[in-house]
């Protein structure tokens, strides 16, 4: 088919070849089957499997962490001892080259274990939905597998391949009972930021467990347990609490949602527990949650939120902070700090930027904001010399050099470098779309999506600090 030069001044266009990507993938699969240009041999269960590193890296975060950089260039044979089974790995390798995943009730658990090991979250979700659809309509109680799948590397390297987001799963597909001893939690350098992290990670976990109690009845779930003793005390400095999703918890998820009651989940007075679980506790252990908290209650005290005995156990050091907020029970050392904190509840923002009109509830926030206009960047990275307006931005930047990703998703295990990124990611699982377009009624998961929509569809002038306003039509 020949092509002729377009006449001068003619409008150009972009033609999309819809079959091109599938043809390229098919050609790569043919090269793999014929052993052409394959540059790595994978030993899975003693069985050698030839593949291309580029394809493995593009599909799996695990292989990306192995082959990235110069160190991966010299890896010609990769053995996975104690890793996924061959019958679970082979379908995944075919999927990488064909985009078709073959599942059956007999192979789904092995494929699920292998996908978890290889950090292929979208495949994990597909396997989970398949298992749930296969067994729940029949009313069959699926016996959990005895052995958990091998754990993949916990810290993903910076810049790992983008994972498929797909459509958000319903919340019921991401609930599970924690089983067995909790795995050791990795050190969290930002665990001191407990208030923010509690509402993102712990609220998600306990609300899921609480929904199981509300929806089900019958004998207690044998797999469900929460850490006790020293494990519970360490929960305030750990970001995971041993809830890494595995094969066992995901299989129990598919079968216990409507048949088991996860009662007696906690027996330790120092532990935060969901309100839904308090009905199964003795009267002496029940407590009312502090105002503003729908998920957690203190098991240590019997009074309302003002009980100081329980709060001192959970938050040592409050004796040096005599000023307490009556709404959320936060404690402060100075009266001025309490007055400033109250603006969080009232929504008052008395401090205004004289340049752009942005308003803030604290003078320190206004001072930090003013550096945007002045160009001042007082915080410098000692590694690369980059400078930042806020010290929080510097701390987040340093993680790029260390490769740390301290914030794990409690549902799928994906780890993130920044807390705000985790918050946005969690909405994929919950289906939450909090950003609303008033003119057309559409909802969006991320603020950037709403701003782009307003600019493209309504001609809005968007600014993160000033309320959006719709401009006149063209």
From Swiss-Prot:
**Tissue-by-tissue expression:** Ubiquitously expressed with higher expression found in heart and lung.
Pfam families referenced in this protein's UniProt entry, alphabetically: BTB, zf-C2H2
Residue ranges with Polar residues bias: 173-183, 210-220, 240-249
Q: Which GO terms describe its molecular function?
A: DNA binding; DNA-binding transcription repressor activity, RNA polymerase II-specific; RNA polymerase II transcription regulatory region sequence-specific DNA binding; zinc ion binding
Does Nucleus appear among the keywords? yes
Question: Which SUPFAM superfamilies does the UniProt entry name for this protein?
Answer: beta-beta-alpha zinc fingers (SSF57667), POZ domain (SSF54695)
Source organism, top-level taxon = Eukaryota
Induction per UniProt is: Induced in activated lymphocytes.
For bias kind Pro residues, which ranges apply?
A: 150-160
Tell where it localizes: Nucleus
Give the boundaries of each C2H2-type zinc finger: 323-345, 351-373, 379-401, 407-429, 435-458
Kindly give the InterPro entries that the UniProt entry links to this protein: BTB/POZ_dom, SKP1/BTB/POZ_sf, Znf_C2H2_sf, Znf_C2H2_type, ZnFinger_BTB_dom_contain
Q: Which GO terms describe its biological process?
A: negative regulation of transcription by RNA polymerase II
**Domain called BTB: residue spans:** 38-105
Quote the biased-composition stretches of kind Basic and acidic residues, using this chain's numbering. Answer: 162-172
Q: What is its main location?
A: nucleus
Region annotated Disordered, chain positions: 144-190, 210-249
Q: Which SMART domains match?
A: BTB, ZnF_C2H2
Question: What does the comment on domains in this protein's record state?
Answer: Amino acids 178-210 are essential for repression activity.
Q: What does this protein do?
A: Acts as a sequence-specific transcriptional repressor in association with BCL6. Necessary for activation of naive T-cells to antigenic stimulation. May attenuate the regulatory effect of BCL6 on antigenic activation of naive CD4 T-cells by forming a heterodimer with BCL6.
Quaternary structure note: Associates with BCL6 through the BTB domain.
Q: Write the protein's name.
A: B-cell CLL/lymphoma 6 member B protein
Which species? Mus musculus
